[in-house]
Amino acid sequence: MEKKQSILSPIIRITFTFLVLCGLVYPLIVTGIAQAVMKDNADGSLIYNDKNEVIGSKLIGQNFTDPRYFQGRVSSIEYKAEASGSNNYAPSNPDLEKRVEKSIEEWKKQNRAVPVTEVPIDLVTNSGSGLDPDISPQAASVQVDRISKLTNITKETLNQLIKDQTEGAALGLFGENRVNVLKLNLELQKLLK
């Protein structure tokens, strides 16, 4: 019996010590460092409106249905973060073809002036997460005609807006140039006022 207690005692102490270290101390230290070094990222990269209200995150896309605004990628989960993920069909899957055809049909309804052959792939296909907040600068540019007609904002102004909101590859190496749709639409909204 004494032998069991002598073995159990250090096991309980070690378990309790690691529980406190890994479950309390480590998370508090990491959170403190994150808040001190990169507060914006640690808080979720939130985007605020003029009234200082949170309207979204630059990391999670939103669905814009008003044709006066730029539209992002297709999302099979309607940009619901709790349902992150997408039906990543194989190129040989007929369901992928149906989904892309449906996206193209919806695109044609709002963008009659743009030939389907000029529609960038990111406007008719899902991202892996279904939450992608960015589109390519080309995907933003093909929407300029529609937005210009509906808002009476010149194409030159809209193209400059896209250029101003275009972000380069991460660290100059990873990924491609991209435009955050929410941030772009916020700048567009300022012009609409």
Curated annotation (Swiss-Prot):
GO terms for cellular component: plasma membrane. It is found in: Cell membrane. It is a single-pass membrane protein. GO terms for molecular function: ATP binding; P-type potassium transmembrane transporter activity. It comes from the Bacteria. The keyword Membrane applies. Its main location: membrane. Keywords: ATP-binding, Cell membrane, Ion transport, Membrane, Nucleotide-binding, Potassium, Potassium transport, Transmembrane, Transmembrane helix, Transport. The keyword Transmembrane helix applies. The system is composed of three essential subunits: KdpA, KdpB and KdpC. Belongs to the KdpC family. Part of the high-affinity ATP-driven potassium transport (or Kdp) system, which catalyzes the hydrolysis of ATP coupled with the electrogenic transport of potassium into the cytoplasm. This subunit acts as a catalytic chaperone that increases the ATP-binding affinity of the ATP-hydrolyzing subunit KdpB by the formation of a transient KdpB/KdpC/ATP ternary complex. This is Potassium-transporting ATPase KdpC subunit. It comes from Bacillus cereus (strain G9842). The gene is kdpC.
